[in-house]
Amino acid sequence: MNGAVTWTMTGSGYLNNSQLFDGNSKPTGTGLAFERDGYGVGLNDDEITTTPMRQEWIEVAFSSPVMVSAFYFLDLFQARTGGTLEIGQASIDGGAPVSLVAVDLAGTGAAGFVAAAFQPIYASVIRFTVLNSNDNLGYADGALAGIELAPVPVPAAGLMLLGGLGGLAMFRRRARA
């Protein structure tokens, strides 16, 4: 594999990202393209949905641990009447979940975009779901928009650089002599 990390995405049902982005404005500063409306579960649904009877999920597994530094969701909304809102969750390697709480009001044309950025942490498996809270329109749902990966530091690179500089210094001394 030459150091390449691969990933697989599975879900509690059919994975779907066929819905075009439908927000009235694209959030900036994330590096996301916002061409699609995120990943969801279901043949006719582009969202991860939770009902009183079931909780859908999406899981992303990496072939080797990667450093994750942010999660992005779309279609998480607050009820227009206040009080209730949708909450996306991401759990790294089965640990305590990171919660992404809706900030956009439902029915306003907003994208329902929520981001959670944090200090990079190693992850092999990330599970995404939505809590059974709601925006009072249908069921609690949201879509996985992205995972941000941080560069992985290479500890040996520093030693190689120092070794190379030391070799150059020694070569230079020999050339002067």
Model-based region annotation:
Residues 66-79:
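A short beta-strand element within beta-rich, extracytoplasmic domains
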Residues 141-169:
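Short, threonine-centered small-residue motifs that mark membrane-proximal processing/anchoring sites
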Residues 56-67, 117-121:
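Extracellular and analogous surface-interaction loops
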Residues 51-61, 76-77:
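An amphipathic, hydrophobic-aromatic interaction surface with interspersed Lys/Arg
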Residues 169-177:
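C-terminal membrane-anchoring or membrane-association module
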Residues 79-95:
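Short, surface-exposed beta-strand/strand-loop-strand elements in extracellular ectodomains
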Residues 95-151:
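Terminal, low-complexity interaction segments
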